[in-house]
UniProtKB/Swiss-Prot annotation:
This is Uncharacterized protein DDB_G0280323. Residues 1-48 are annotated as: Disordered. Residues 37-48 have a biased composition (Gly residues). Residues 21-36 have a biased composition (Low complexity). The lineage of its organism: Eukaryota, Amoebozoa, Evosea, Eumycetozoa, Dictyostelia.
Length: 48
């Protein structure tokens, strides 16, 4: 899969994920709200 960093709301039809800051090894990915907005205005679109 291609991980594309974005800083704008993801378009419909994409798999939307938001970045959840974590004090562990790496940031975790969590599903974005149903409105499609990415938390903090940053996240990734994962495409096949």
């Amino acid at each position: 899969m291609t991980k594309i960093p974005i800083n704008i709301p993801a378009t419909s039809g994409k798999i939307k994920f938001g970045i959840t800051p974590s004090s562990n090894k790496s940031p975790s990915l969590s599903p974005s709200p149903s409105n499609g907005q990415l938390g903090g205005g940053r996240g990734y679109i994962l495409e096949p």
